[in-house]
């Protein structure tokens, strides 16, 4: 059974979050949590929170066994960008872009199948 957890407008850029997401895609839950615990990035804390939420959703809503869960899909999409101004010399200003992201994690209790190309 597939279970989804989302975090909208996470205060980190999609580029930084995708580095962490690539580490856990397709892994089983125990191994993924272990990777995120020892990953030395702020993005790993955000992804770990969403992953724990997905695990709780699977356990509560579908009665899934935690030991059989795997990260089936993890999507990092760009969210809205907050635009701020930074004063510069001679009355000018520069634009600062504060980027946000949407994190979506799908966990499944079935094995993740490898996609093999044809030809």
UniProtKB/Swiss-Prot annotation:
Q: Which GO terms describe its biological process?
A: translation
Q: Which residues form a coiled coil?
A: none
Q: Which Pfam family is one of this chain's hits?
A: Ribosomal_L22
Entry GO CC: cytosolic large ribosomal subunit
What does the function comment of this entry state? This protein binds specifically to 23S rRNA; its binding is stimulated by other ribosomal proteins, e.g. L4, L17, and L20. It is important during the early stages of 50S assembly. It makes multiple contacts with different domains of the 23S rRNA in the assembled 50S subunit and ribosome.
Q: Which family does it belong to?
A: Belongs to the universal ribosomal protein uL22 family.
Q: Output this protein's name.
A: Large ribosomal subunit protein uL22
Recorded source organism is: Buchnera aphidicola subsp. Baizongia pistaciae (strain Bp)
Tell me the classification of the organism that encodes this protein.
Answer: Bacteria, Pseudomonadati, Pseudomonadota, Gammaproteobacteria, Enterobacterales
Which gene name does the record give? rplV
């Amino acid at each position: 059974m597939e279970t989804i957890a989302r975090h909208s407008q996470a205060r980190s850029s999609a580029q930084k979050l995708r580095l962490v997401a690539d580490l856990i895609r397709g892994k089983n839950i125990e191994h993924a949590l272990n990777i995120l615990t020892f990953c030395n990035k702020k993005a790993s804390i955000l992804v770990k929170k969403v992953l724990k939420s997905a695990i709780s959703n699977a356990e509560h809503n579908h009665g899934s066994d935690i030991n059989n869960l795997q990260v089936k899909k993890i999507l990092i999409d760009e969210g809205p960008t907050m635009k701020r101004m930074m004063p510069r010399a001679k009355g000018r200003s520069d634009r600062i872009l504060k980027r946000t992201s949407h994190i979506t994690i799908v966990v499944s209790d079935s094995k993740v199948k490898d996609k093999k190309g044809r030809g």
